[in-house]
């Protein structure tokens, strides 16, 4: 039986003979041959292992080859629809860029630019000068530097200012910032020496003072943006640490994480420390992310006293961690939105989604509900109240009131419907609970409505 099946396997030349010549030219004959060899070899191996009891026909091998090459040509990084209600969704790319920032990236990608060219002097310039001015204007810092992410920013600052020196940190601030990336490990890699003070839930100013030695290089304060310690707690403010640091002539470094530039508590969100407040407290060097609460591209932004920033700029690691022209283009425009707070709230998608009026979200839900009425033979739709989250390791206590579209079906259960939506040509990521699939309208964009309709229609008609 096995020998008969192996003999029945079609030859490569025979399969090639039934391909359209245009397909061979478009994909390349060698590529098609290679894919066919893999397909036939897989079938041969399965026959020998007695996993299958059939040999592929020429037509079946051709179909598999076409499908495989089509999949190979698809983008791995693709558009998805975020129906989860998590605004800064780490796994879905974090913050979206504004229309203007997106256009700036496209322009930088499609044309030459003055990335490192001083147009006034007609000579080589610095890429950092393109963005340092706007960061200084918005934050009030003496100087600024941008690297490729906030973990890199922390590591670079510590290596530049505290190599082989002790850095004093509260035990309650030894955070893990995601992907098992922990402050102690970052510090170790930077060659700074960690000195832990206080306890997980309670640290006093005298703990910092008692830990000072001749080897002390800095105090480090880390904002616990992705968790909260409640109950019997005590922490020391940046202002208190800065007062002590001035007495002892020791620099203070603060990682405030998410990069909040405006007080969002006035919009009903949880109060988070802003970059400006940190600098006003007297912190010498502040680091934060560009693609979280700030709403821009992935970057680590370092601001603070010029004497410290200048030293950081001279570190050889700075070149290894530098940002490209796309990041600079996106970040510059995003930051310019902040020159007018109203413009920032309206134009930066992250801020706009977080501050959306509940009435507007309900209108979105009603609109989607009406769009989907034609699919009532496949599904039952309803609108429910729910909660969104900020995401991105930011504001863990903030629950944002929202409206959800609930999808029920008699023909497909919620697990399979979620999978079908996730595997659609434009993946739709949803929530599943209470025996149904839910779409949170807070994170649905204008172009998403039609895709959601088409996806549900195609799934229903299967």
Curated annotation (Swiss-Prot):
Entry keyword Transmembrane: no
Metabolic or biological pathway, per its Swiss-Prot or TrEMBL entry: Aminoacyl-tRNA biosynthesis; selenocysteinyl-tRNA(Sec) biosynthesis; selenocysteinyl-tRNA(Sec) from L-seryl-tRNA(Sec) (bacterial route): step 1/1
EC number: 2.9.1.1
GO biological process: conversion of seryl-tRNAsec to selenocys-tRNAsec; selenocysteine incorporation
GO cellular component: cytoplasm
Gene3D superfamilies: 3.90.1150.180, Type I PLP-dependent aspartate aminotransferase-like (Major domain) (3.40.640.10)
Cofactor names: pyridoxal 5'-phosphate
Primary localisation category: cytoplasm
Highest taxon of the lineage: Bacteria
Catalysis performed (reactions): L-seryl-tRNA(Sec) + selenophosphate + H(+) = L-selenocysteinyl-tRNA(Sec) + phosphate
Subcellular location: Cytoplasm
GO molecular function: L-seryl-tRNA(Sec) selenium transferase activity
Keywords in alphabetical order: Cytoplasm, Protein biosynthesis, Pyridoxal phosphate, Selenium, Transferase
Tagged with keyword Kinase: no
Modification N6-(pyridoxal phosphate)lysine, positions: 292
InterPro entries in UniProt: PyrdxlP-dep_Trfase, PyrdxlP-dep_Trfase_major, SelA-like, SelA_trans
Protein family per UniProt: Belongs to the SelA family.
Function as written in the Swiss-Prot or TrEMBL entry: Converts seryl-tRNA(Sec) to selenocysteinyl-tRNA(Sec) required for selenoprotein biosynthesis.
Record-linked NCBIfam families: selA
Protein name: L-seryl-tRNA(Sec) selenium transferase
Organism: Clostridium perfringens (strain ATCC 13124 / DSM 756 / JCM 1290 / NCIMB 6125 / NCTC 8237 / Type A)
Lineage of the organism: Bacteria, Bacillati, Bacillota, Clostridia, Eubacteriales
């Amino acid at each position: 039986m096995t020998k008969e099946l192996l003999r029945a396997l079609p030859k490569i030349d025979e399969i090639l003979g039934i391909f359209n010549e245009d397909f061979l030219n478009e994909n390349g004959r060698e590529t098609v041959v290679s894919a066919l060899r893999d397909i036939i070899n897989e079938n041969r191996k399965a026959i020998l292992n007695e996993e299958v009891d059939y040999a592929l026909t020429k037509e079946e091998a051709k179909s598999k080859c076409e499908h495989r090459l089509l999949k190979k040509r698809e983008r791995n990084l693709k558009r998805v629809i975020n129906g989860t209600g998590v605004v800064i969704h780490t796994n879905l790319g974090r913050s979206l860029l504004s229309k203007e920032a997106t256009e700036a990236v496209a322009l930088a990608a499609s044309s030459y630019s003055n990335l490192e060219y001083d147009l006034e002097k007609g000579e080589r310039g610095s890429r950092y000068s393109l963005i340092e001015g706007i960061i200084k204007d918005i934050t009030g810092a003496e100087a600024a530097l941008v690297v490729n992410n906030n973990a890199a920013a922390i590591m670079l600052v510590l290596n530049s200012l505290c190599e082989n020196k002790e850095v004093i940190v509260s035990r309650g601030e030894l955070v893990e910032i995601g992907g098992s990336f922990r402050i102690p490990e970052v510090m170790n890699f930077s060659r700074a020496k960690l000195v832990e003070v206080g306890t997980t839930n309670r640290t006093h100013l005298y703990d910092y003072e008692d830990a000072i030695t001749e080897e002390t290089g800095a105090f480090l304060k880390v904002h616990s943006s992705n968790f909260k310690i409640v109950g019997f707690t005590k922490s020391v403010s940046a202002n208190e640490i800065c007062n002590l640091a001035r007495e002892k002539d020791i620099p203070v470094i603060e990682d405030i994480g998410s990069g909040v530039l405006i007080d969002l508590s006035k919009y009903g969100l949880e109060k988070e420390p802003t970059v400006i407040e940190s600098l006003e407290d007297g912190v010498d060097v502040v680091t934060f992310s560009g693609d979280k609460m700030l709403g821009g591209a992935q970057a680590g932004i370092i601001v603070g006293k010029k004497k410290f920033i200048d030293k950081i700029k001279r570190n050889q690691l700075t070149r290894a961690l530098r940002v490209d022209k796309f990041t600079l283009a996106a970040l510059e425009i995003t930051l310019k939105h902040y020159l007018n707070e109203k413009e920032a709230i309206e134009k930066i998608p992250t801020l706009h989604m977080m501050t959306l009026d509940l009435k507007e979200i309900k209108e979105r839900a009603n609109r989607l509900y009406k769009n989907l009425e034609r699919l009532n033979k496949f599904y039952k739709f309803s609108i429910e109240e729910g909660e969104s989250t900020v995401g991105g390791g930011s504001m863990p206590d903030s629950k944002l009131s929202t409206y959800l579209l609930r999808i029920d079906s008699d023909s497909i259960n919620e697990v399979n419907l979620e999978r079908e939506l996730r595997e659609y040509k434009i993946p739709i990521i949803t929530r599943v609970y209470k025996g149904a699939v839910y779409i949170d309208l807070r994170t649905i964009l204008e172009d998403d409505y039609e895709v959601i309709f088409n996806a549900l229609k195609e799934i229903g008609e299967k």
